[in-house]
Amino acid sequence: MGKITVETCEIEGLKVITPTVFGDARGYFMETYNYNDFKEAGIDQVFVQDNQSASVKNVLRGLHFQINYPKDKLVRVVEGEVFDVAVDLRPGSRTYGKWFGVTLSAENKKQFFIPKNFAHGFVVLSDYAEFVYKCTDFYHPNDEGGLKFDDPDIGIDWPVASKEDLIMSDKDTKWGGIKEYTASRNQ
């Protein structure tokens, strides 16, 4: 291996990946994804869709998931800085409802692997950020799910000065909490 360093997280399945960066007077080079290296690190997924978004400071996107078509994600930032969060929604998981967050930036070049059945979201910390992610399933617009970003039962510690300064889509302001989600899944 050697081209990537993989850190396991407190929540099983989540992984923070740091690539090896080769730099000189011209700039730098790194592999952002190599199937063999990722497979050796225990990330043996086939990605079928890449997405990219651009956002300004204080934009919060999330917490999102697909209900019937869950997908793994490999996320990174190519410009700026975000605080990226995953919430465990795996049925029967000992860490169900727990969250983990990591700062991703163009500077630290870290990537975050998020397995199926996690809610995902991020907030932009820099003036501007471009966010890139690979997915193991396609987007299904009629299969969207979400959780309230500030649900006290999850307790995410978003590194923002004020919730009032956040910029969110109308849809993201209307998601319910994890108790409502859990009750709806148990019916």
Where are these regions (language model features)?
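Short beta-strand His + acidic residue motifs that chelate non-heme Fe in jelly-roll/DSBH
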Residues: F112, H120-L125, Y133
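Non-catalytic, conserved peripheral segments adjacent to functional cores
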Residues: M1-E107, S126-Y128, C135-Q187
